[in-house]
Amino acid sequence: MTEIGREPKKKSKGNRAIRMNLFFLAVFVLFTALIFKLGVVQIVEGEQHEEDAEKSNAKTAYYPAPRGKMYDRNQKVAVDNQSVPEIVYVSTSSTKTEDKIKTAKRLASFIHIDTEFLKERDLRDYWIAAHPKKAAALLKESESNLKGDQAYKLQIERVPDQELKAIQQDDEEMETAAIYTRFSSGNAYEPQIVKAMNPNKSNSNGKNGALLDEKKNSSQRPKNDLTYDEISIVSEHLEELPGIDIVNDWTRKYPYDKTLYSVFGGVTTPDQGLLSDRKDFYLTRGYANNDRVGKSYLEYQYEEYLNSHKEKVEYVEDNKGNVVSQKTIDKGSRGYDLQLSFDMELQAKVEKIIEEEVRNSRARGNYMLDRAFAVMMDPNNGDILSMAGKKIDLKTNKIEDYAIGAFTTQYEMGSAVKGATVLAGYQDGIPHYKYYIDAPMLLGTNLIKKSYTNMGTINELTALQKSSNVYMFNVAMHIAGVTYKPHGSLPADQNDLLKMRNYYSQFGLGVKTGIDLPQESAGMQTTPKTVGGLILDLAIGQYDTYTPLQMAQYISVIANGGYRVQPRIVTSIHKPGKKDQLGKAIEHRKPKVLNKINNSESDLKQVQTGMKLVTSSGTAKNTFTEDVSGKTGTAETFYYGTNRNWWGKKTYNLTFVGYYPSKKPKVAFSVVVPSVDDDDKINKIIAKRAIHAYAELEKKHSKK
């Protein structure tokens, strides 16, 4: 029995040994796998994990790259960039206030800096930063537990006035305060411009956009503009100036000087930074507070394309926030380039013509004349070939670019609108060759409406040729459903006025043209309590006001056979190309027809015939050497310009609209000259010279 009872114990010991062996085997396998994994991590993946660890402590700074360029239709650079040296400051996560103060003081010993921008609040901030113990003493013991912002607010309020005066009386400390303020304008790893070179002060001729000289130039103002001497000395002491660097930034350069300057628009400075009304819009798209953005016209309109892809520099910090390495991870690139519809050579010639003729007209006694405009566009695709405007300062006699006035200011255009009136009459049922008697019209007891002379029996052709007002009055009355009776009333109402305006709007008169620029005016339309005879004034361009650009669009409709084409300035957008060459196009802006007028081909041919009569034997005969068709305009008005002493004085706006050549026109144009005598010919002279300049350039380009 005893022998039989011992057998189970032997089996139990054997099972235990097997389990122990299996356990040790499992432990061995696990340790082997762990060792293998550690080997993989350390040897195979070591570099990757090290990079990942560095990335967790990496910070990125963005440095500016140039904006996109603008080219004219002939691929000539119209708006360029040039490199500008500047001193920048970049703080890190571990940068303390005392570090900024120390660096600011050291930098102030090497450079001069303008202090005019400093405000009292800046000086208070600087004093607290420069005197931390004194600033702490400004708080009462009971205020020691206040939160940082609350405590700082009290300190700012309590900075002693004598301390501020002491700073203001010390030029060196004022410059230190200015530098410290620049340092503190942004966040860590956000480069702050301390001082930049002014390219416009670096050459003797003073032309805007000339390249920086490669040698020192004494004409630079030392406080406002960085000098080569300052660059040299700062470069020698960079090790003593943590966070300071000298980099190349950019500024706009204009190869054609002030030509079209206002239309190109402006760009903010780093001090101005983002536009306040669009700040959130820009910040959500990765902009920094001190980034420069387009602030007007083309620069503003095409900001999303012109804005550059910034250079990225990566800074790696240790656990204490100290920078242990830095490297450029993206060199950045300039923004997209724009190809414009402008012919810069033509533009320059037309601007010169306007400037010369404005001065000539003023010399003839037109002392109230202070501006003139000429717009030239391709009537077939809407390309603006030239948009020139000049405005003279009546006090200094200096003439400035005012091209933006061609689409932002409006004027009574006079008889130049009569082509639209005739076509409106056709739409309203007036037949071709409808005859009226051109004689004074007597309305009511004492209102006389007439042409400048009695023309007898006329139709639409002679009405355009001789510029009959009476024919147009009859068109307006037909539209209003009124039959003329001597000394009778003219019961036209708001509906009649609206009906005429709707006819005109088909041509672009009284509505925006759709040009790709901000702030376009639609002209001015009022709503009178009583319409009556005002509808007659509307028919001859003496009531509603229009822009010079609207007039160019209107005459383009007649020139191209009845299509209102949207004016365009940017024709295509391109990737940056080689030096002064367009790169690959990323977008082509196709011509856009906004509407077709409700007139037949024969209607348009009839008006085209009338406009040819104007230049061959009418009010513009012997004006052009080229085959031009068009219409003159004279609007009686009153002066309400910049000189209030002349307000209310009677004057005239002289205008001209036309196209060239008369058959298959390539260019349509408008000329608008406000505030001149009615017998002056400045409108015709500008039109003649502008078309001649176009024709000469056309010959020149055809030979290439």
From Swiss-Prot:
Its main location: membrane. GO terms for cellular component: plasma membrane. Pathway: Cell wall biogenesis; peptidoglycan biosynthesis. It comes from the Bacteria. Coiled coil: none annotated. It is found in: Cell membrane. The chain crosses the membrane at residues 23-43. It is a single-pass membrane protein. Involved in the polymerization of peptidoglycan. Plays a redundant role with PBP-2A (pbpA) in determining the rod shape of the cell during vegetative growth and spore outgrowth. This is Penicillin-binding protein H. It comes from Bacillus subtilis (strain 168). The lineage of its organism: Bacteria, Bacillati, Bacillota, Bacilli, Bacillales.
